[in-house]
Regions:
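P-loop/Walker-type NTP enzyme "switch/lid" segment
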Residues: 2-8, 15-96, 100, 186-191
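Hydrophobic anchor at the start of a short beta-strand
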Residues: 27-28, 85, 109, 141-143, ...
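C-terminal boundary of histidine-terminating zinc-finger modules
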Residues: 184-203
């Protein structure tokens, strides 16, 4: 997850998607690369919910803090056993070195963006950094915009999709609506309500992976084939989604 500014939904997207991928049967690692530590704080607060037994049920996957300028060198060893690695990056404008290191690691870079002219305009510096980082990679990462905080039945979502397409962005087919269940979810266990949207987002990301892509994107019995995992390295999905040289998916 990458963006120029804070407050664009990177942490919310990373946490909800991590729950979706683990629910589908994947081994998931959530990397909090933001010095503010919002994802790690969310996990800690959610574990205090008295309704949970055991506390680790709040976030049924590993969460590690790695706000490092050499994240792309250190993370492969940490993520070696994981199917999906999701990196919650800091804003580029204040922590460029850390964010760029994450961009060097990820296979797919997801840019959360509200359907507003100012946020669409701010995607341009992100794309410029992605292009620059590509020179330091063996092959360029995929990148796509995730429209979020969309108002139901408003023209702004379609207008934003059209504007981004005119700028040659890939835009994920699923748009995340502006709902209280997402806005108020920080610090709490992620509820069942509202997950279907994120399942569709996960499916959109998996659809973008070059085959074979063994990462599951839905509930058990409704996922992509994983047989190829035995014989082929796994692709990395990002922003949601980086991965290790062994081939995990990293958004």
């Amino acid at each position: 997850m990458a963006n120029l500014k804070p407050g664009t939904g990177k942490t919310t997207s990373a946490v909800w998607l991590a729950h979706i991928f683990v629910q589908a049967g994947n081994s998931v690692l959530l990397v909090d690369a933001d010095p503010s530590g919002s994802a790690l704080e969310w996990a800690d607060l959610a574990a205090m919910d008295p309704r949970l037994a055991p506390p680790q049920a709040a976030f049924p996957f590993r969460v590690v803090a790695l706000p490092s300028r050499d994240l792309h060198r250190r993370l492969p060893a940490i993520a070696q056993a994981d199917d999906v690695v999701i990196i919650d990056t800091p804003q580029l404008e204040d922590h460029a070195a850390i964010a760029l290191s994450a961009l060097r690691y990820a296979d797919e870079i997801v840019i959360p963006c509200a359907p507003s002219p100012i946020e669409i305009n701010r995607t341009t510096p992100v794309r410029e950094e992605i292009t620059e980082v590509a020179a330091a990679r063996d092959q360029p990462a995929r990148s796509a915009v995730l429209l979020n905080r969309c108002v139901a039945r408003a023209h702004s979502t379609a207008d934003a999709r059209e504007a981004l397409a005119s700028l040659d962005y890939d835009v994920l087919g699923t748009a995340v609506p502006r709902l209280e269940v997402y806005a108020q979810s920080f610090g709490r266990p992620v509820p069942g309500t509202g997950r279907q949207v994120w399942r569709r987002v996960a499916h959109d990301l998996i659809e973008r992976c070059p085959p074979p892509c063994p990462v599951r994107s839905g509930p058990p019995g409704h996922h992509l084939p994983a047989q190829a995992a035995q014989d082929h390295p796994r692709p990395r999905v990002p922003g949601i989604t980086g991965s290790s040289p062994g081939g995990r998916t990293r958004p």
